Amino acid sequence: MPSSSSPAAAAAGEGSGRKKAAGRRLAGVMLLLRLASLCFAVAAAAFAATDGAALRAAPFRFLLAANAIVAVYSAFEVAAAAWEVAGGATLLPEAMQLWFDFGHDQGFGYMALAAAAAAAREAATCGSHGGGTACVQGDIAVGLGFAGFAAVAAAAAASGYRLACFLATGSRSPASPSSSPY
């Protein structure tokens, strides 16, 4: 038997399906970005922590502390993103989760960048002291710190996009294209 639903209702249902698929894709991208920031932050903290000579310098201690903090935050965000991908809902109420993510991404991204920049300046002078492997290990920690910042910055851009979608449409998913030909 033919369905009694109107073509407009069918088009609305199709648009809703596209909107959900776009939201799932964006949540999946967010999960990958959060996982990348976690991996880079943990690796940068590990390299900074195992370099005893570099830890005598305050910028490397700052790099270690900042990346450890970013790693803890990223672990929480990986769990929240996995929860969202698996269940389709956020841990916190939607508006609160979006503002939490956007604000903390900005703050922790800046902290990661500041720490990597401070340690990079110190690492640049390391070669003149004849540090050898300690200098190489410090350079790797700085590079991983910058990579961690890049991942947090990309996640901040994506969370900013989700927040803008929420403010514009009332949903964290991007608006679906209209089925109207006009």
UniProtKB/Swiss-Prot annotation:
GO terms for cellular component: plasma membrane. Disulfide bonds: none annotated. It comes from Oryza sativa subsp. japonica. Its main location: membrane. The chain crosses the membrane at residues 29-49, 62-82, 98-118, 140-160. Coiled coil: none annotated. Residues 1-28, 83-97, 161-182 are cytoplasmic. Residues 50-61, 119-139 are extracellular. Belongs to the Casparian strip membrane proteins (CASP) family. This is CASP-like protein 4C1. It is a multi-pass membrane protein. It is found in: Cell membrane. InterPro entries: CASP_dom. Homodimer and heterodimers. Keywords: Cell membrane, Membrane, Transmembrane, Transmembrane helix. It holds the Pfam family CASP_dom.
